[in-house]
Amino acid sequence: MKMHSSLTTLCALLWLVSAGRAANTGSAFYGDAPDEHHPWAVHDRNRPQPKLVTPGTFSSPEQPGKPPSDAVVLFDGTDLSKWEADEGSGVPTKWVIKDGAMECVPHSGYIRTRESIGDCQLHVEWAAPSRVEGESQGRGNSGVFMMGLVEIQVLDDYNNPTYADGFAAAVYGQNPPLANALRPPGEFQSYDIVFRRPIFKDGRELDPGWVTVFENGVLVQDHTRLEGPTGHGARSKPGPFPEAGPLKLQDHGNPVRYRNIWYRPLPPRAIEGGTDGYLSVEATQVKRQQIAAVIRQDAEKLADPANPLPQLLRLAESLVYDADGDALEKTAQLANEYLANLQQLPADKLEARKDQIKHLRDVCNYLVRFNVIPADAEQRAEIEQIIKDHNWDQKKK
């Protein structure tokens, strides 16, 4: 009996033994198998479940909403303990809190978070002064600086024309917003920002970085490519960013107010070690081996000389990710034990396993399709013969 062909039989039992485990998270040997750029199968039951997050509530101009349960709250309207002046570490800010909002004291300087923040989803609400003064860039001007380097413009553009790449929600000096969705001055506006920093390695750009912005719920920056740190008057130049930096709010000489500021850290991209999405060949192979190792450990816990089936199925599942030699050998051993028992069954008990055996054929076909076992595996032919001998493929009239 060939080792690979023994392996084929093992999988049949997935239908019986693993049915309970897979009922809610999917089935093994179902969707397309892992490939050179995807460590997970399609509809992979072994893939980690998304974490649970309790959603917050939406804000209105009159009332701030509540952050989601996993948000890091930077300002809740009560204190500035997470903020400092941009002059140096530990220097207290001169900005003040009024009616649940922090307000810029003109010419007191920028304010920044004490902690450094990298890729994130950021929520911030701001309001220009109710009393309209100035025009163009001189009216209700401030800015939200991601990592202290990329400015998402804050400006009272309500009936106030200015240059396009300086409008509210512009990536300042780089890209105008898709729309002007501001409310009248004095009312709170909301920004929801998804920020991904540029990534460089050995002086080479791997990812330019991107930003998406919603202004009052309206998409105004659609996965906009970053061109480096923003600035005034000069063309931005791409370059490496640190992994994280402080969030800064600009003092541009106007008493702009901010409230309800929170963020959610984002997971790493594939290019920096993340395991979702389109991975490199090398990263995919490493992750597939890690997944297989976890499944093999799981299979070991199922060892039972009186019933080799559970361990057999789980171990076979690991081979879809990594055809480890020892795992193949152990799988063949378990398959032999199962097949020997199957061959000794009386006809009535064999008939009772019809659906299981037919499912096993499907599993064998899956493993052949994805080159886990050879097409001429002996057990595959044996299973087909059993099905043929009992006319199990014959449709009832």
Region spans (language model):
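A general, composition-driven signal for non-globular sequence regions
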Residues: 9, 15, 39-41
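Carbohydrate-interacting regions of secretory-pathway proteins
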Residues: 23-397
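Hydrophobic h-region of N-terminal signal peptides that target proteins for export
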Residues: 13-21
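Compositionally biased regions
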Residues: 6-7, 19, 28
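Bacterial N-terminal signal peptides that target proteins for export
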Residues: 1-10
